[in-house]
A protein has these predicted regions:
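Intrinsic, low-complexity polybasic segments
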Residues: 475, 480-485, 494-495, 524-530, ...
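Rossmann-fold NAD(P)-binding glycine/threonine-rich loop
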Residues: 93-163
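Intrinsic-disorder-associated, low-complexity terminal segments enriched in Asp/Asn/His/Tyr and depleted
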Residues: 483-485, 499, 511-513, 532, ...
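Long, compositionally biased stretches enriched for glycine and/or charged residues
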Residues: 188-469, 474
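Internal, well-ordered domain-core segments that constitute the primary functional module
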Residues: 132-214
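N-terminal Rossmann-like dinucleotide-binding module
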Residues: 5-32, 36
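NAD(P)-binding Rossmann-fold cofactor-contacting core
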Residues: 32-52
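Short acidic low-complexity segments
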Residues: 65-78
């Protein structure tokens, strides 16, 4: 009998996402007999996911087997594919913190899951857990492919490639195919008649080509139609999924840069210094920018899930609809050798020659029995490279902070963020990062190592990082409020359990009256590169392929 694949879901309590991916998997003959291992640290959500998965199997009449695990290592045993989807810290407290603390400084955000101070903090919370998954994979299933659906995608992908270069990983997002659908809808052209090619970084890739197949087999550039429709007021059409989120920002950027960005307008608005400005409500109104959009979605999704969970429990069968996620396509291509094309986030390694070699790039990838093979793009138009590089700077410094355990680079990352820098001065940026680190102390790693440095804030607090510190006991505190029994951060451990002890203690912040010093050594830095085929051996997708 032919061996069936094992698919492990880490963070299986993300039930709606899990339902979509498993529904896709079960409809593919090559995967319908798979063993599906669900792992989550929340017993209730894990039970709900098991119920949903079981009913999907029943609906399809599949031979798939469903397992549930609270142990990450147990779930990974024998895995061929590892799908990861989770959010560290959830809506409360962490998402609320990421929005409310910056708001005190007049810094407003829309999504805060990719860049900016919200994206930096989310990366700081998330990457250590992804590293622990990679550590367990290297020990238990080193040949498995990691399909990562976690934000901040670019920071996560970059950090995994740096510390675990032998992990076969790809970061997956649905923005490329989702935006193609939106533009096809605006143009009133069937999506299957449109050919496109995009490249850049996650949430800031651009369509380098966007064309319509003609009756004679040739292709016509659709960019003039998009620009004309926007200037005539016909585009964008009202959103078919969220009336709070018109698509005006991206169309405006198209008229300035000549290319359409793949992530939504509400996302893109906070990646640049142009659209969200304190004291400029006219910009918010003109472009329909939905401030605090992500918290609103979280509240709506939490309420919606209450009804969905009850409906899934009572349903005899669960209807399956094909999703637009790439996961099942990748699994099918790797397992059967049947080729497919996806858009994936991988270590650049020269795919985009105008971006750093070690950054995380989003490019077309060919998938077959040999795995996921990024394709060569070359040099992006200079205006796109320049804009993307402003975001790469923030990602690079955040990863540097994580790799070297140097908290100073978190301040540097916020300093370089386009939106933050346009709104706040340097003292405000440093103070904001202080406040966010203090608020997130239960969710972020503790580090031993940072270069020794001191800085005094205007309120008299002195911040100290010392490479030789071994004890994490002293913490950040404003003058007169120091609690020596409160560690700055809680050590992060296996899976997504924030209270297990696995990572090194963090640099800590002292009040000026504290004199405590200890000794120790910084953790060894580990660098590397995910091995892609040499540029000369990479294949470029055929111009006849409709992506």
């Amino acid at each position: 009998m032919t061996r069936q694949p094992k698919i492990t879901f880490i963070g299986a309590g993300s039930t709606v996402f899990m339902k979509n991916v498993i529904g896709d998997v079960l409809q593919r003959p090559s995967l319908s007999g798979a063993t599906i291992a669900l792992m989550d640290v929340n017993p209730q959500r894990l039970e709900e996911s098991e119920i949903v998965a079981g009913k999907l199997v029943k609906t399809v009449g599949s031979a798939a087997t469903i397992e549930t695990h609270s142990s990450q290592r147990k779930a990974l045993e024998g895995a061929d594919f590892v799908v990861v989807a989770f959010q560290i810290g959830g809506y409360e407290p962490c998402t609320v913190t990421d929005f409310e603390v910056p708001k005190k400084y007049g810094l407003r955000q829309t999504i805060a899951d990719t860049l900016g101070v919200g994206g930096i903090m989310r990366g700081l919370r998330t990457v250590p857990h992804l590293w622990k998954i990679c550590e367990d994979m290297m020990a238990i299933c080193p040949d498995a492919i990691l399909l990562q659906y976690v934000n901040p995608m670019a920071i996560n992908t970059w950090a995994i490639a740096e510390k675990y270069p032998l992990i076969k990983q790809v970061g997956l997002c649905h923005s490329v195919q989702g935006t193609a659908f939106e533009l096809a809808r605006d143009l009133e052209i069937p999506l299957e008649e449109i050919r496109y090619r995009a490249a850049g970084i996650n949430h800031m890739a651009f369509y380098l080509k966007f064309e319509h197949r003609q009756a004679d087999g040739s292709y016509r550039d659709l960019y003039p139609d998009l620009v004309r429709g926007y200037r005539d007021g016909r585009f964008p059409k009202p959103s078919h999924w969220n009336p709070r989120c018109p698509n005006k920002v991206r169309y405006e950027v198209l008229t300035r840069l000549g290319y359409f960005v793949t992530e939504s307008s509400e996302h893109f608005a906070e990646y640049t210094p142009y659209f969200i400005k304190d004291g400029r409500p006219d910009l918010i109104e003109k472009f329909g920018i939905p401030l605090d959009e992500y918290p609103k979605r979280c509240i709506e999704q939490i309420e919606r899930w209450k009804g969905q969970a009850a409906a899934y429990r009572s349903a005899e069968n669960i209807e399956i609809e094909e999703s637009h996620e790439y996961a099942s396509s990748i699994m099918n291509s790797v397992w059967t050798g049947e080729p497919s094309v996806i858009y994936g986030n991988v270590r650049n390694n020269g795919c985009i020659t105008s971006l750093p070699e070690n950054c995380a790039a989003e490019v077309p990838c060919l998938v077959d029995a040999s795995g996921i093979q990024p394709t060569f793009i070359g040099t992006l138009p200079p205006q796109l490279t320049a804009l993307i590089r402003t975001n790469v700077n923030v990602q690079e410094l955040t990863v540097a902070a994580l790799m070297t355990e140097n908290r100073e680079h978190l301040y540097h990352a916020a300093m370089m963020d386009p939106h933050t820098a346009a709104e706040l001065d340097l003292d405000q940026i440093w103070s904001l990062v202080d406040d966010l680190l203090a608020a997130h102390r239960d969710w972020i790693p503790e580090w031993r190592g940072s270069r020794k440095t001191c800085r005094q804030r205007k309120d008299g607090t002195v911040l100290v990082w010392n490479r030789d510190m071994a004890s994490p006991t002293p913490t950040f505190s404003r003058t007169g409020s120091h609690d020596p029994d409160r560690p700055f951060g809680r050590r992060l451990g296996s899976g997504i359990q924030p209270d297990a002890r696995a990572y090194e203690p963090a640099p800590v912040l002292f009040d000026s009256h504290l004199k405590r010093q200890t000794s120790g050594k910084c953790s060894r830095m580990v660098f590397g590169a995910w091995i892609n085929p040499p540029v000369s051996q990479r294949r470029v997708p055929s111009q006849d392929v409709v992506f």
